[in-house]
Swiss-Prot record:
Organism: Methanococcus maripaludis (strain C6 / ATCC BAA-1332)
Record's keyword terms, sorted: Ribonucleoprotein, Ribosomal protein, RNA-binding, rRNA-binding
Name assigned to this protein: Large ribosomal subunit protein uL2
Ranges annotated as biased composition (Polar residues): 1-11
Subunit structure: Part of the 50S ribosomal subunit. Forms a bridge to the 30S subunit in the 70S ribosome.
Family: Belongs to the universal ribosomal protein uL2 family.
One GO process term, biological-process aspect: cytoplasmic translation
Length: 240
């Protein structure tokens, strides 16, 4: 009997592969899309800036004028004590939240909603931003960091500016232990060992006097879980 593959262990859901969500500061999303934001604006004050484990960007605790508190992603240049505005009549300034339809073309935005009121789904990593490309009747086109242009409802909210925490990838990890701790906060198993580098007991591609597959890489979709590695139910393999 061989040992279980990493995909089988992950499916079992042991602590190694389970996201440590109990360490999170809380949900990071916009306040509910109420009449106060639809008709005007509401002011909020940044009372604290926090580090959220497993998140690449810092988060801010914002207290609004109605004493409601929220965790939000902050842009570069915001500090404790500054005020932000949320609503259709908010000023075009980094940190302010407006519907996409009210943001001029060419302005960088982040934490974009895909459905009005969902709290923000797109462009949330540190240092990321998207651009408002154009407006049309009933739609706004936004260019995402990947280069893909997405058509969205103009009522979807977004934050003006660039997410704080940019440049994080420029500093090397240097030590393997630092990378291990960084990725363990996101429940990512690291390092990732190749199957051909394993022993025969650990992987179907393991063993042998040199590193090679030793068998076809294509497998049936209905094969047993312990053998389901490589190109699963592939129509074709190799270069085109």
């Amino acid at each position: 009997m061989g040992k279980r593959l990493i995909s089988q262990n992950r499916g079992r859901g042991t602590p190694k592969y389970r996201s440590p969500s109990h360490k999170r500061k809380g949900a990071v999303k916009y306040r509910s899309y109420d009449e106060m934001e639809k008709d005007g604006k509401i002011l909020g004050t940044v009372v604290d800036i926090l580090h959220d484990p497993g998140r690449s960007a810092p988060v801010a605790k914002v207290r609004f004028a109605n004493d409601e508190e929220r965790l939000v992603l902050i842009p570069e240049g915001i500090q404790v004590g500054e005020e932000i505005e949320c609503g259709i009549s908010a000023e075009i300034k980094p940190g302010n939240v407006l519907p996409l339809g009210e943001i001029p073309e060419g302005i960088p935005v982040y934490n974009i909603e895909t459905i009005p009121g969902d709290g923000g789904k797109l462009v949330r990593s540190g240092g990321c931003y998207a651009h408002v490309v154009s407006h049309d009747v009933g739609k706004t086109i936004v260019k995402l960091p990947s280069g893909f242009s997405k058509v969205l409802n103009p009522a979807c909210r977004a934050t003006v500016g660039v997410v704080a925490g940019g440049g994080r990838k420029e500093k090397p990890f240097v030590k393997a232990g630092k990378k291990h701790h960084s990725l363990s906060a996101k429940a990512i198993a690291w390092p990732k060992v190749r199957g051909v580098a394993m022993n025969a007991v650990d992987h179907p591609y393991g063993g042998g006097r040199h590193q090679h597959l030793g068998k076809p890489s294509s497998v049936s979709r209905h094969t047993s879980p312990g053998r389901k590695v490589g190109h699963i139910a592939s129509r074709r393999t190799g270069r085109k």
